[in-house]
Structure formats: C-alpha cells, structure tokens
Amino acid sequence: ANAKIGENCIINSKALIEHDAIIEDFCHIATNTVINGAAIVRQGSFVGSGVITKQGVKVEKNSFIKAGSLVK
C-alpha cells in the first residue's frame, strides 16, 4: 500500500497521510491533518489545520477546506 504525493506540495508537520492516499500537485496540507486511506486530494487544494478526511474521500480540484473540518 503506497501513498502518492505530487510535485510542489507543502506537507506541514504532524500531518498524517495514510495508505493509498493520493495528494496531487500543488496541494497544501496543513499541520495536524489526517488524510485517511485511499483519499484523493486533487490538484491545487488547501487542507486546513486539524482537518480529518474519511477513507476514500475525493477532494475536488482547487478546494479550500476550513481548519477543523471533517470531510465525509
């Protein structure tokens, strides 16, 4: 099981990216964020501090997810 991180991404400290997750190019993953298994964060998206994504979630291109959100 492999996670994939695209080019020119920013992954801040204490961010957790689990198995089979895909972070496309130019994404910013903030501190204390959990990207659960098989989730996809599409190109150019910002995922705020403390966000948790459920397994298999797809975050659309150029999305902005507010800090502390739960994405189902």
Task: Annotate each predicted stretch with a short phrase.
Residues 1-72:
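Structural signal for interior beta-strand "rungs" in well-ordered beta-sheet cores
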